[in-house]
Amino acid sequence: MKKLYILTLLICLTSFGASFAQTLKGHIYDAKTNEPLVGAAVTYKLHGNQGVVSNINGEYEIKLPEGGVDLVFSYVGYDDVLMPIVIGKREVVTKDVYMKESTKLLEEVVVSAGRFEQKLSDVTVSMDVVKSGDIARQAPTDISSTLRTLPGVDIVDKQPSMRGGSGWTYGVGARSQILVDGMSTLNPKTGEINWNTVPLENVEQVEVIKGASSVLYGSSALNGIINIRTARPGLTPKTRFSAYVGVYGDAENDEYQWSDKSFWKDDKYAVKPILRGSLLSGVRNPIYEGFDLSHSRRIGNFDVSGGINLFTDEGYRQQGYNKRFRMGGSLTYHQPDMGMKILNYGFNVDFLSNQYGDFFIWRSPTEVYKPSPFTNMGREENNFHIDPFINYVNPENGTSHKIKGRFYYSADNIVRPTDGASITDILGNMGTDAQTIQNIAGGDYSSLYPALVGIGSGLINGNLDDAMNGIFTSLGNIFPNATTADYCDLISWAMDNGLPSDLDKLVQDGKLPSDLVPWLSNVINPSRNNPKTQTDKNFDYYLDYQFNKKWDCGAQITTGATFEHIRYDSAIMDEVYKSDNIAAFFQYDQRFWDRLSVSAGVRTEYYRVNNHHREAETKIFGTKVPFRPVFRAGLNYQLADYSFIRASFGQGYRNPSINEKYLRKDIGGVGVYPNLNINPEKGFNAELGFKQGYKIGNFQGFVDVAGFYTQYKDMVEFQFGLFNNANYTMINSIGDAIQMLSDGKGFGIGAQFHNVSKAQIYGVEISTNGVYNFNKNTKLFYNLGYVYTEPRDADYQERNAVEGLYTDPLQMKEKSNTGKYLKYRPKHSFKATVDFQWKRINVGANVAWKSKILAVDYLMMDERPKMQNDLMDYVRGILFG
C-alpha cells in the first residue's frame, strides 16, 4: 500500500509538471497612474481555483496548462480584467495588464472592519467612507470639520460620538477610538483626541465604523472607530501645497461683539497670524490662516514622504484660540529579490507643538462669546512619536505577519490665557463709586469691613441665610449694578485669593485679623509674577503583532497580541502613574457561495495601574478573573446585484483613563477631581442593516438603512458640584461648606466622574451617498442622512426617588429634569452635504439640523427668563453655552 501511494504521488507530480510547462508573465499596472499593483491576483479555474499574486514591483508569473484558458486579473477596489489566452506547449508569453479603479461606490476598499482589505459591500457593520477628494472639497482646518458632516457622527466639545453613544465628555474619556494607519491617536493619559495631531495634509481615506469594535481595537472602541489612512508614495513624485485664510463674521447680536480693529494692536489676542500685521491689519473680526505642504516619492527601493502644517486661529470666541506646528513623515524600505514574497519595513514619525484655549461656560447671557472666569483655560502641548514597523507577506501560502511599535512622548501644561479680573475692576463693573475704589486702591479698606462682618457673622453662626443677608445688607450700596457675571467674577477672585484667617475676631470683638491688611494689599495689588509652570510628562511604549492566514476556500483568520506601557508624571499630584495593558485577539472570516460573509471574533485584555492589578476584573461563571473577554459576530448576505443585508453583534468596554480615575486637574478655575471607585464601562451593540446600490440615469450611489440597539452598564458620566480640595469628596451640605470656610479650608468647583448604572440607546439611521454626472467635467456629489435615537437612562426612576428627598441646595441632582433621557443628546438629526464640481472648481454646502438637547447637568439650570429671544437655548429655561 505504501509503495502504491508513493507511485501515485510520483505520477501526479510528473503529470503536473508536463501539463504546466507553459508560462505567462508580465506586470500589472494601474491604468491611470501606471503604478504597479502589489498583491493583484491572477487566477483561472482548473480542478478548483489556481493562481498567483503580483510582487512588490507588480510582476507576476504563472504556469498554465497547454491550450486555452480564461485568466482573471483581480484587485480589491479595481474592475476585474478577463483575458482569454491560448498558449502552446512549453511556450513563454509576456503580457502586461492595466486595471481600472472601480467607480462603483460599493467596491471601495476598507481595512478597519476586519484589519484586512475587503470591499465596503462585504463588511458586516455600518461603515462610512470619506475619500481624500471629499475632504479636499470641504477645505477643513482639521479632520473633525469633515467628520461632523457624516450622518450619525457628532463632535461634541471636540470628542466624537456615534449615534448618541457619548454626550459631553468634558475633554476626556472618548468612547470612540481614533486611529491613524491603525495606530491610536488618543492621549494615553486622558483618553481624549487632539485633532491637531492628525496629518490632514496627507489623508487618503477615512473609515468610520458605528458600533462596538473592542474585539479588534480594544478599550475606547466601545462606541466605534475612526480610522484615518494616509497616502503612500508612488512611482510619480507628488507635491501638494495649500494655503487658506478666513475671517469670522459679525455676531448676530451687536452686544455679543467682543473684538474691534485695535484688538490685535493691543495684543489682546492670544495668538497673532502672519497676515494680521499686513494684509488683514484693518479687519475688526478674528481671523485664521494656515498652509499645508507635503511631498512623497519612491527612490529606488525606498518610499519617502514628509509634510508640514502651520495653522493660527484667533477664534470666534474670546480666548478660543488655536496655534499649531506639525511636521512628520515616513520611510519604507522594500526588500528586493524576494520573488513573489513581500517584505518591507520602516518607520513613521511625527512632531506637534500646539497652543490652544477653550471654554465651555459663557460669561453671561449677553456675553456668550466671552469665557466665564471659572473656565478660563488654555493648554500648551508638545508631543513626539516614532512608529517602527515590519510587514511580511507570503502569497504562496496565504500568510502575512505585521509588527508595529510606538514610542510616544508628550509634555503639556494648563495655562490661563488671561489674568482674572482685579478686585478694583470687579467693583467698578458692579457700580461701586469711584471714591470707594480709589480709597481701596490707595490702601483704605474700611469700606470693606462691614461686608466682612456680615459674611463672617453668617459663617460663624452656621446660618446660610444670615450670611447671604449679611452680604446683601452690607454691600447693597457698594454693588448697586451687580450682575450674575460680576458675582461669578467675585467668587472666582475669592477662590483664587481665599479669606483672611481669624475672621471670627472681627465679628465677635471688633479686632482686626492679624493678616487682614496684608491680605487686602495682596489681593488689591497682586503680584504679576507668572505662576510656576507645572508640566505633565507622558511616555507611551506600544507593540502590536498581527498574523493573517487565507485559504482558497474563502476562509481566513486574523489573530495577534498587543502590549502597551504608559508612564505619566503628574506635576500637580507630584506622583508617577504607570499602567500596563496586555491583550490577545482572534477573528475568523469566511465567504460562502460568493454571497455570504460571516465574521466572528474574541478578545481578552488585562489592565493595571500602579498597584491596582485588577482594573479589568470581571466574572466568568461566577469566578472573578483579572482579565476581560469580549466577543463579536456578524454576517453579510448579497440578496441580488448591489443589494446587501447585514446583521452584527459586538461587545465593548472602556477602561477609565488615568485622568478620570486618579488625577486632580485644574482647568481654568474648574477642577476635575479623581474618583477611585469608578469601574470600566461595558456594553454591547446590535444592528440590522440593508444596503442597496442604484444607477438611475446619471445618478449613481447607494441607500443604507440600519436599525441599532446599544446598551451600556456602568456608563461613565461626570457630575458638577463643590469639592473638598483635601480629600476630593463632593460637598453635599451648606453646613459642611460653611464649616470648611470657617476652619480656613478651601473647596473648589468642578466635576467628578462616576458610573451610571445602565443606559440604553436605540434608533434608526437612513442615508444615501452618491454622484450625479452631468458630463465628464461636471458632477454633483451628495451625502444625505437622518438619524433617530432614543437615549434612555434606564435607572432614572430610582434616581428620581432618591433625589426627591434632597433638601440641601448643595445636594446636587444628576440632570436638569426628571425625564428618562440621557444628558446632552438630541432625538433627531439631519445632515446634508452637497458639492458641485466643474473641472477643478468646487462649490459646496453643508447643512445640519438637530432637535433640542433632552437634558443637561443640573448645575446648568437657570430659572430666570431668557435675556434675548434669539439666544440659543437648548432646553427652555436653560442658559448654557
Where are these regions (language model features)?
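Short, acidic, small-residue-rich periplasmic hinge/interaction motif at the N-terminus
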Residues: 29-33, 38-45, 74-78, 88, ...
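Extracytoplasmic beta-strand/coil segments of soluble accessory domains associated
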Residues: 61, 127, 144-183, 187
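Flexible loop and strand-edge segments within Gram-negative outer membrane beta-barrel domains
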Residues: 313-328, 332-397, 407-427, 530-539, ...
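Membrane-embedded beta-barrel scaffold of Gram-negative outer-membrane proteins
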Residues: 402-406, 410-414, 638, 644-648, ...
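Structural signature of Gram-negative outer-membrane beta-barrels, strongest in the C-terminal barrel
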Residues: 550-566, 570-710
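Gram-negative outer-membrane beta-barrel transporters
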Residues: 708-711, 730-859
